[in-house]
Amino acid sequence: MTNTRKATQVAVVIPTYKARNHILAVINGIGPEVARIYVVDDCCPDGSGDFVAANCKDIRVTVIKHTENQGVGGAVMTGYQAAIVDGAEVLVKIDSDGQMDPTLIKDFVTPIVNGESDYTKGNRFFDLEKVQSMPNVRIFGNAVLSLMCKFSSGYWNIFDPTNGFTAIHAEVASRLPFKKISRRYFFETDMLFRLNILRAVVMDIPMDANYGDEVSNLRISKIIGEFLVKHGLRLVKWCKFVGSLKRRLYRR
């Protein structure tokens, strides 16, 4: 799917929920390579969206507010759609809790601009020395989730599937079935499943092994069971898709 192409408009989507203490610092850390910033308030009880609107002077920022909580996936989809309508060509997603370094945005965008990838995602497991600082249960949990993701998505070379620092070409994003993608914490891994159906090229981008971003949002030990079920369902869907494709080719 990947062709050489030049992206001239980069947009950042920031889903926010209970992140009032960090959101302004995240926005301030985003460099001039980004043309537009979409802060999606997912019906946040502390009014993060209103707080940004009242205190942020960055003219690139647009605040979008959900009247009902839709989960991180729902917030990202809302941001994607707004950015696509406004003409963005590369869509970056970064969390609002300050655990992701905005200066790395260029690293995520460059492979897409150069036509090397359709979708880039963070990987905190490149540096083994830094990984050793993680709690063992977290290392084990991520290893299990990564293995499940490899089976269900077909991307055998990727790791750290729950990492939410990502970038995607708008052309590819516009082909995703937004209404079918998981809205909650399974969002990132479900994205990989959908991208493989599109034959999209996915690339891991090394980043610091900061595991604090998962503490406030999810606990791996509590969602492995749920993820196992959902990965199993995705694997069944993938087998059905491949079987259907083979039957069509056979009939020809």
Question: Model segments located where?
Answer:
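Cell-envelope/extracellular polymer assembly enzymes that use nucleotide-activated donors
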Residues: Q9-A11, R36, D190
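Acceptor/aglycone-binding surface of glycosyltransferases and processive sugar-polymer synthases
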Residues: H66-V85, P102-Y185, G212-K222, E226
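Short beta-strand-to-loop acidic/aromatic patch adjacent to the donor-nucleotide binding site
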Residues: A88-Q99
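Acidic helix N-cap motif at the loop->helix transition within catalytic regions
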Residues: N21-A25, D46-N55
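Short hydrophobic beta-strand elements that form part
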Residues: A11-P15, Y38, K65
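A conserved acidic beta->alpha catalytic loop
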Residues: D41-D50, E68, G98
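Hydrophobic helical membrane-anchoring modules
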Residues: M1-A7, K179-R252
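Short, well-formed alpha-helical segments that are part of the catalytic scaffolds
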Residues: Y17-P32
